[in-house]
Regions:
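Bacterial N-terminal signal peptides
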Residues: 11-22
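N-terminal capping segment at the start of a domain
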Residues: 31-71, 209-219, 288, 355, ...
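Noncatalytic luminal/extracellular "stalk/propeptide" segments of secretory-pathway proteins
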Residues: 29-30, 36-39, 58, 62-173
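Short helix-loop-beta-strand segments that form the rim/entrance of peptidase-like active sites
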Residues: 55, 63, 312-337, 356
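A conserved hydrophobic secondary-structure block that centers on an alpha-helix together
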Residues: 150-206
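Second-shell loop/turn segments in exported
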Residues: 40-48, 62-73, 138-143, 172-188, ...
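Soluble metallo-hydrolase cores and metallopeptidase-like ectodomains found primarily
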Residues: 36-39, 113-115, 121-154, 217-296, ...
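Metal-dependent peptidase/peptidase-like ectodomains
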Residues: 117-119, 133, 138, 228, ...
């Protein structure tokens, strides 16, 4: 079975079954009315053949491409999405604008100067400041972790380029990513505090290709506390080998553009509920991406999943009891700013948000079903789990975190 379609089906089941209103005890498995079961089975059957979700991400990445937060391309993505959602028949389509600090890379180059001159594949991290024009050259000091850097004295860091060579642990559920990004967020600040001149981190990820993975560092404005970049895994290995033989000098040239304010926005569309239209089941993804690729996986695939799932529900003969609201969040990559903006704008409506789900972790085989349901809703979690078993999806825990943007919502 196509993995993106498995993800689509999971979203459909959650969105469909969460519309139930009967009561059951926490240790029971909820009884699902026959009509709802039939709808679920129909949605699964359609979902296995449906191509709306795939077409959405294919066309988004082809016709718009990379969608850096605050850029003209992100604005085009909002216009493109509203048109697509209208063509698909959704209701109440609108954009909710907000402003963000804007950052973009202009130059990011790195090289080993001595003892073995050669280029390195690097990429500036989001929020990095610029180096002096032409770059900065200094001796490298290597640390195996952020903890090691924090424990180091300023005397050994001052005037040097810090290299954090911490590797990401490969895990099935991706939990190693959260640990790995700490160096990306904090390296520049800690380096600056210890009078280092720049920070270089081993690229976050478990692949070994000569490609550097970007992402956001901590900041309170358009830029952070110093120049910072990621280096590809093969170049990190090369740098480590050279350091084993003696001192190494490198050059980093990073030039960025930053503005205090730029436009962004959340795109919203709905399948209006037939009985309780004021009550909302939110399905979210983020529309922005970084600029080094097309944003197909992060998070074009997530937007394809939620749009495809909601469209299948829209195609049913009868509307759902509650409103299904799609939110294509803006500016997630640069600080979950769309999530903050939505939570602030809709603060008075949170009592009407019944459930939220987000797709922002790629599209691959679904192997486990985790939830975060209240005690009274746990029987429905168990019912959903039972219905997912034929797809090879195992029961999980009730401690799910949802996703970055919906994590900004108050407890539902």
């Amino acid at each position: 079975m196509n993995s993106s379609r498995r993800t689509l089906i999971l979203r459909l089941w959650v969105a469909s079954l969460c519309l139930l209103t009967s009561v059951a005890h926490a240790q029971d498995v909820a009884e699902i009315p026959d009509a709802v079961r039939e709808n679920v089975e129909l949605l699964v059957h359609k979902g296995l053949e449906d191509t709306v979700g795939y077409a959405f991400v294919r066309d988004l990445t082809t016709e718009v491409g990379p969608r850096l937060a605050g850029s003209e391309a992100e604005a085009r993505a909002r216009s493109w999405s509203t048109q697509k959602l209208a063509e698909l028949g959704f209701a109440n389509i609108r954009t909710e604008p907000f402003t963000i600090p804007y950052w973009s890379r202009r130059v990011d180059r790195g090289s080993i100067v001595s003892p073995a001159p050669q280029n390195m594949v690097i990429t500036a991290l989001g929020g990095s400041t610029s180096t002096p024009p032409g770059g900065v050259e200094a001796e490298v000091i290597r640390f195996e972790s952020m903890r090691e850097l924090r424990a180091a004295s300023s005397d050994i860091v001052a005037g040097k380029i810090v290299f954090i060579d911490e590797k990401m642990t490969r895990t099935q559920d991706g939990s190693g990513y959260g640990m790995a990004v700490r160096k990306r967020r904090n390296c520049a600040t800690t380096t600056s505090e210890k009078d280092g001149v720049a920070c270089l981190i081993r690229s976050v990820g478990t692949q070994d290709r000569r490609f550097a993975h970007t992402g956001m560092m901590s900041r309170s404005a358009a830029v952070g506390d110093g120049p910072a970049a990621a280096v590809s895994p093969p170049d990190a290995e090369q740098l480590t080998r050279l350091l084993e033989n003696g001192p190494v000098r490198i050059r980093l040239d990073i030039q960025v553009e930053a503005q205090s304010e730029a436009p962004s926005g959340n795109v919203i569309a709905e399948v209006v509920g037939r009985e309780r239209p004021e009550e909302v089941v939110l399905l979210g993804c983020h529309l922005d991406s970084w600029d080094l690729g097309t944003g197909a996986v992060d998070d074009g695939a997530g937007c394809g999943i939620v749009v495809g799932a909601a469209h299948l529900i829209l195609s049913l003969d009868e509307a759902p009891r509650r409103t299904i609201r799609i939110v294509l969040y803006g500016a997630e990559e640069v600080g979950v700013l769309g999530g903050h903006a939505y939570a602030k704008r809709h603060a008075d409506e949170m009592d009407h948000h019944i459930l939220a789900a987000e797709s922002d972790f790629g599209a691959d085989k679904i192997y486990r079903f985790d939830t975060r349901f209240g005690e009274g809703a746990l029987p429905y979690a168990r019912a959903i789990q039972q219905m997912l078993e034929p797809l090879g999806i195992a029961p999980g825990h009730n401690l799910a975190g949802g996703g970055p943007d919906i994590s900004m919502l108050p407890e539902l």
